[in-house]
Amino acid sequence: MLSTPPNLLSSRPPSAGRIAVLGGGITGLTTAWRLQRAGLAPVVFEQSGQPGGAIGAITRDGWRHELGPNSLLEGSAEVAALIADVGLGGRRIYAAPAAKQRYIVRDGRMIAMPGSPWAFLGTPLFSWRAKLALLGEPWRRPSPADAEESVADFVVRRLGREFLDYAINPLVGGVYAGDPTLLSVRQAFPKLHALEQAHGSLIRGAWAQRKIRGGPKERIFSFPDGLEELPFALARPLGAAVRLGHRVLGVARGEDGWRVEFERGGVRGGETFAAVVVALPAGVIAALPVENIPGAGRLAALSEIEHPPVVSVFTGYTRAQVRHPLDGFGVLVPQVERRQILGTLFSSTLFPGRAPAGHVALTTFVGGTRDPQLAGLDDPALLRVVQGELASLLGASGAPVFTHVQRWPRAIPQYTLGYQRFKDVVTAVEASAPGFFIGGNCRDGISLANCMEAGRRLADAAAKYVTREGV
């Protein structure tokens, strides 16, 4: 059980290897776990009452609503190794085979995304004009490597308007809850940008990667008790070093190290550390008082990073209430369809334990950059919107037998055009303050895998600093 040390008012001199980690989400926990494995002494300050950040679940009467991320992608050896090292290798449950199929709405009906070249030729999702135009993609000139281009412009230039409207736009809505006309392709989808730069073509690049791809397959997985098993597994060996319910008030650099001031339950305290790792949301970093660092005030610019509101609406039905077979990962809704949802996950198809026997669970997302005003509706109004959309798309009849609404007022950082300036601010502040490190989804990518990889980067940098400086 994670606990909080009683000596809140202690003011201790820095001891060798003590590193403050601000934020107990996946980035912070991965950082601390790796630092401990390296023989150092991390202390995690987390304001909420449990580790994991956006990861969490509501479990009631046989239903499980994943409040934030719903799954992990086993797409890198690093992620697979970390899962095994924290003791969860044997607890992975992989998405059902049916989850390979994904639906897109076109002209009011759900159409399966083609999963092969032959299926692509026959799909009604794209017109023959769009399919034929795609044949010219390998011969289209790439943009300059340093060009700042939106995701929308990139896709239209390489693949055509229809692929933007009925493939990339719904994908961006599902991943970022964002707008492809606003996002930077280099920042939001760096792999797409890299494919074009390396191979001159997305199609040629995809074929080349298929030939050389090794390591684990990109399989989707979770755990029997949901994704929150991961942060708890990371936090468990850290024990009392995870300080829950601690709000960080400020950080200051001094002659004897880094002073972290904090508050818990109205009681203030402070401790000194050899180094500080900041793994907090962008808006929290922007508002964090940081003293005695040249140019630290520039971090206030991070408050300008857009985070649209998103609401996750969980609805449970009896199997007989839903006409659609729910034989897929879920359905994404293109903006051109003018509907009121971003998409719906078929949660009980993905993994077992999400709904009682004889029932189905659906997780629907509302809001984002596309419709931020809808995220402001009250719960009854939101449920009416979602029920109406599910009735139209999936043939869901009657009221759901279970519901839960989870609101994220500032959901996902938007890697918009010009986003590099925010990263440059962070880099400049770090350069002016040895022993002060910043990472997380506002800098390293928004996926859980990105955050886990950021934790490794931050731990390596902090450990190298402490070891080199002998502090």
Give, region by region, the residue ranges found by the protein language model.
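Conserved Rossmann-like nucleotide-cofactor binding loop
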Residues: 27, 50, 283
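Glycine-rich FAD pyrophosphate-binding loop
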Residues: 36-60
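Dinucleotide-binding Rossmann-like beta1-alpha1 core, especially the glycine-rich loop
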Residues: 61-143
